Amino acid sequence: MNTSPHVVYPDQVASYRPANHTGTSNRRIIGRDTVGARRLEVLIGTISKGHGAQRHAHPSLEQASYLLCGAGVSEVYGQQRHMSAGDWGFSPEGVFHSFTVTSEEPAQVLVVYAPPYQENPRAAVLYNPAHPQPEPRPPLTTALAPVPVCWEGTEGARVETIVDTATAGAQHLAIHRVVAAAGSQGRARQLKNRERVLYVLEGAVEGQADQRAFEARAGSLVFIPEGALWQWRSGRAGPTFFVIDGFAAEPLPI
């Protein structure tokens, strides 16, 4: 049983139907209403075959998406990309994007917004071919290749950058993958000028956040509030988890 206020499981959150999508059911796991998040939002969407996100853009926020299962075709900057489980995608501010599921099984997608979206109709623009809008210049590739990095204070774990300013030009979010061996740990540090979410892919992560102990198993998310002192250690089996940071310049008011 989960007793930590910092750990949230998807089935603890009610589902909703997002705008600009078809055949999609979302659960907003990390947000203002669930954990008081002000700098980022994390949800999991379940999408049926042939459905997904219509072509739209978010003028004032960034979006990153990770395919947990299933397969589909994404489109960013007018470039199509076939995605399968384990792939990340990134949509910068103001860039039109879409996603359609191609697998027989429904796809599940982990989605990150920074700043938070919260289904604000003013934060989304549906594509209108009769009145195309200018977009930022596209990069050479929209594929995201992990970059190994060394994190001070992290022992016994391999860390890779998935999305940040250097790899994808992100201005409001950063995503890293941590592959930890048994006995790995991250020494206590204070989280400054950002909020942090851990998404546990495999194994279990234990630790403390804001003087409260937590234990998070595969499929759960841990929210670390801005200013909190936190640390982590691996469970009996070495875990794999994402570290998702949101550092939007102007956090939402509580």
List where the protein language model places each region.
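Conserved short histidine dyad/triad with adjacent acidic residue
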Residues: 24-31, 43-58, 159-164, 174-192, ...
